[in-house]
Amino acid sequence: MKKLLFTLLLAAFILPFAAAQGKLEVGKKAPEWALPDASKQEFTMNSWPGKVLQINYVDPDNEDLNDTFNDAVEKAIDIDKIIDQNAYKGFGIVDLQSTRLPDGLVRAIAGRKAKRYNTTILFDSKGVLHESWGLPKDSYSVVIVDKNRIVRGIYYGKIADADIPGIIEMIVKLTKE
């Protein structure tokens, strides 16, 4: 009986720690991944060395949820010129496990977004980032990582308009480090 109780207590302490391994946490290094684009070319975070990354992990059913935020970032790059394009890369990862939309339609939506924001779109067909980063399904998550791949911000769902200037300010500071 004591052995069973000890085993259960040990499992209660170890399992949460093991489950947390690899999950995103602000201030910690982001676990690496490899995902393909539409032409099946593999990308990792190291595909953009020395750049601050804004990673949009998107359920195609919510693809427009953070357009206001992305438009503000685009303005900060192209018009205000406060984000150095040589030190920053924003891109999308389509969460194919969170939708029932046909693959062709999802790829068309992704192609439209890639053109609109002049960016790369990757595809997560196996839910890699659900597992390794703990990102929720059926949502839109934005992750900011610095040049050393340390997580500096995690935003779930719609980013509030009031939070946008602060996030852009953080990106500006990170690109200058």
Language-model features, listed with the residues they occupy:
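Loop/turn elements at helix/coil->beta-strand transitions in domains of secreted/extracellular proteins
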Residues: 50-53, 84-89, 117-119, 140, ...
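Sec-dependent N-terminal signal peptides
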Residues: 4-16
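Thiol-/selenol-based redox modules, centered on thioredoxin-like
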Residues: 138-177
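N-terminal "domain-start" segment that seeds a small globular fold
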Residues: 21-43, 64-69
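Short, internal strand/loop/helix patches
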Residues: 89-93, 103-138
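Short active-site neighborhood of thiol/selenol oxidoreductases, capturing the structured segment around
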Residues: 44-69
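Structural microenvironment flanking redox-active thiols in thiol-disulfide oxidoreductases
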Residues: 62-113
